[in-house]
Amino acid sequence: MSAGRNPHSGSYTQEVFGPVASFYVVDSEDEAITLANATPFGLGGSVFTADIERGRSVARRIESGMVFVNHSTFTAPELPFGGIKNSGYGRELSELGFGEFVNR
């Protein structure tokens, strides 16, 4: 876990693979979403909240290939996996993943 990081630090501006959780203090939900979307990457993320509907609303506003509510990111064969922005090369797994490899 990493707290009090600057959004301009390497751990924020570079894609980190590993069991890393960074925490940033913000004053509003909108500021949190702006901060989450300010990265050039978008593989996956999570929203943790006691209000599930609010969490889903926030998750829809985050620019990431996969956003989970009250769960860390994970993969399952029936779910499409992949990022957006500078993360990944499209989708894999599920029917959407097969579509990445065929001509239509």
Language-model features: locations:
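Conserved C-terminal structural/oligomerization subdomain of aldehyde/semialdehyde dehydrogenase
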Residues: 1-104
